[in-house]
């Protein structure tokens, strides 16, 4: 290890930046974020750098660097393209014992800047010791996606209660166990779900009760998207990997299910039109029962749980019973499948609105507001419309839509098995029979479908028609 990782307090201390360009500006911003008072020396100073220094009450010295600029500084940055000058700044700083960083010159540095993931007060630094800064930045980019932005709030909560916990738990090992449980439990989850006030209230109650606690479960209603695992949200993935029990249905792709916690109990509650492995009311009760046992329950649903996913029915029961829950939206099939098929749902020349329609109603019929559905300038997207497709096409034409209106079938959209068939309202049912199209299949009706020939970019493993 060539450099020892340390975090340096610069609050209210003087930091010298030699240089006035964009590189100097980037370094100065970091110093200002850390609370440093800036002294910038350069014959010409970038306008944004000038404003940054003035806002922080620092010093602007618009002239050449002088050796007398260094005394009293806690840190020195050389950010010029003048190599002899950078070397001079480094030599003088080392002679005075002042930490110095020379941009893009590791050999002249006594300190180096890492790639930073800032979730203040939680900060993660990644460094290659100056050997591969681009690699360090790539690793930082990965960490940015893995560490929720709300982790800073979680660290702040812990800071505010640190002394009280220490008084209640003087034993170091007991405190360690307490914090480990807190950071992996319901209080932390409230913070990460954007409910910090609720988290603080729960922690207050726990401390007031002498730390005695009965675990309370929670339900995560998570949208798994249309099929491609890369379309999962960060929050969805985090909750999938911490749930104790997973309830999933047939629209959840196996590749997505595999991303759930390995040792989580999995319960299939798959639903198909008019066929239910587990009736909806039983699913609702099961969510309540499992959460009441103190378990973290993941209800994983294809697409978005609030768009033809019956998510509202499931959390209605939870709300009535006082069971904590959170909802994580997913990319709905209309958006995901249309994008992967190269069919924009709206377009200035073809469609100024889009309508999502269920292909069958609660009683199994296809009794829809047909007159509204034939209005011009709109795209129709039918969910669960395969069985009722002949009726849908017939009724749209009967109510005034042209039989030659472009239409598309997207089977298993966004996955490697995606198949797309385009035609018209007149021949769409025939395409289903000819190509043995099966669920899950999305139906899109509208002039935008004709853009697929030009905009298609994703091809599944099977040929389209």
Curated annotation (Swiss-Prot):
Residues 217-465 are annotated as: Uroporphyrinogen-III C-methyltransferase. One of its GO terms (molecular function) is NAD binding. InterPro entries: 4pyrrol_Mease (IPR000878), 4pyrrol_Methylase_sf (IPR035996), 4pyrrole_Mease_sub1 (IPR014777), 4pyrrole_Mease_sub2 (IPR014776), CobA/CysG_C (IPR006366), NAD(P)-bd_dom_sf (IPR036291), Siro_Cobalamin_biosynth (IPR050161), Sirohaem_synt_dimer_dom_sf (IPR037115). One of its GO terms (biological process) is methylation. PROSITE patterns: SUMT_2 (PS00840). CDD domains: SUMT (cd11642). In the N-terminal section; belongs to the precorrin-2 dehydrogenase / sirohydrochlorin ferrochelatase family. In the C-terminal section; belongs to the precorrin methyltransferase family. The modification Phosphoserine is found at residue 128. The active site is at 249 (proton acceptor), 271 (proton donor). Its EC number is 2.1.1.107, 1.3.1.76, 4.99.1.4. Then it catalyzes the NAD-dependent ring dehydrogenation of precorrin-2 to yield sirohydrochlorin. Finally, it catalyzes the ferrochelation of sirohydrochlorin to yield siroheme. NAD(+) binds at residues 22-23, 43-44. It catalyses: uroporphyrinogen III + 2 S-adenosyl-L-methionine = precorrin-2 + 2 S-adenosyl-L-homocysteine + H(+); precorrin-2 + NAD(+) = sirohydrochlorin + NADH + 2 H(+); siroheme + 2 H(+) = sirohydrochlorin + Fe(2+). Keywords: Cobalamin biosynthesis, Lyase, Methyltransferase, Multifunctional enzyme, NAD, Oxidoreductase, Phosphoprotein, Porphyrin biosynthesis, S-adenosyl-L-methionine, Transferase. Residues 1-203 are annotated as: Precorrin-2 dehydrogenase /sirohydrochlorin ferrochelatase. It comes from the Bacteria. The gene is cysG. S-adenosyl-L-methionine binds at residues 226, 302-304, 307, 332-333, 384, 413. This is Siroheme synthase. It comes from Pseudomonas aeruginosa (strain UCBPP-PA14). Pathway: Cofactor biosynthesis; adenosylcobalamin biosynthesis; precorrin-2 from uroporphyrinogen III: step 1/1; Cofactor biosynthesis; adenosylcobalamin biosynthesis; sirohydrochlorin from precorrin-2: step 1/1; Porphyrin-containing compound metabolism; siroheme biosynthesis; precorrin-2 from uroporphyrinogen III: step 1/1; Porphyrin-containing compound metabolism; siroheme biosynthesis; siroheme from sirohydrochlorin: step 1/1. Disulfide bonds: none annotated.
């Amino acid at each position: 290890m060539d450099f020892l990782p340390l975090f340096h307090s610069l609050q209210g201390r003087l930091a010298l930046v030699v240089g006035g360009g964009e590189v100097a500006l980037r370094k100065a911003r970091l110093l200002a974020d850390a609370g440093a008072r800036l002294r910038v020396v350069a014959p010409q100073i970038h306008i944004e750098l000038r404003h940054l220094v003035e806002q922080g009450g620092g010093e602007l010295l618009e002239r050449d660097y002088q050796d007398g600029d260094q005394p009293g500084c806690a840190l020195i940055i050389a950010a010029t393209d003048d190599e002899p000058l950078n070397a001079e700044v480094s030599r003088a700083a080392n002679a005075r014992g002042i930490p110095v960083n020379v941009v893009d010159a590791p050999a002249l540095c006594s300190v180096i800047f890492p790639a930073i993931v800032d979730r203040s007060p939680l900060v993660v630094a990644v460094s290659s010791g100056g050997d591969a800064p681009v690699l360090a930045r790539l690793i930082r980019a990965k960490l940015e996606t893995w560490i929720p932005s709300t982790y800073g709030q979680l660290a702040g909560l812990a800071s505010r209660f640190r002394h009280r916990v220490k008084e209640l738990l003087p034993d170091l090992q007991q405190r360690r166990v307490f914090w480990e449980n807190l950071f992996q439990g319901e209080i932390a989850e409230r913070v990460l779900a954007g409910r910090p006030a609720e988290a603080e209230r729960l922690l207050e109650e726990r401390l007031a009760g002498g730390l005695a606690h009965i675990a309370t479960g929670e339900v995560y209603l998570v949208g798994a998207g249309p099929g491609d695992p890369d379309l999962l949200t960060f929050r969805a993935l985090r909750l999938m990997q911490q749930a104790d029990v997973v309830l999933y249905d047939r629209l959840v792709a196996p590749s997505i299910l595999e991303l759930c916690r390995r040792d989580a109990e999995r319960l299939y509650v798959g639903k198909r039109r008019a066929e239910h492995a587990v009736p909806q009311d039983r699913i609702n009760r099961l969510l309540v029962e499992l959460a009441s046992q103190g378990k973290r329950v993941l209800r994983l649903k294809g697409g978005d749980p609030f768009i033809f996913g019956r998510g509202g029915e499931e959390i209605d029961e939870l709300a009535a019973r006082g069971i904590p829950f959170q909802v994580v939206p997913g990319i709905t099939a209309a958006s995901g499948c249309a994008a992967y098929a190269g069919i924009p749902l709206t377009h200035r020349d073809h469609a100024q609105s889009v309508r999502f329609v269920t292909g069958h109603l609660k009683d199994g019929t296809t009794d829809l507001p047909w007159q509204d559905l034939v209005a011009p300038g709109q795209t129709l997207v039918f969910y669960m419309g395969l069985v009722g497709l002949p009726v849908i096409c017939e009724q749209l034409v009967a109510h005034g839509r042209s039989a030659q209106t472009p239409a598309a079938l997207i089977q298993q959209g966004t996955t490697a098995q995606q198949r797309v068939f385009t035609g018209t309202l007149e021949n769409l049912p025939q395409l289903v029979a000819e190509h043995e199209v099966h669920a899950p299949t999305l139906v899109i009706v509208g002039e935008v479908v004709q853009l697929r020939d030009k905009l298609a970019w994703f091809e599944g493993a099977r040929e389209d028609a």
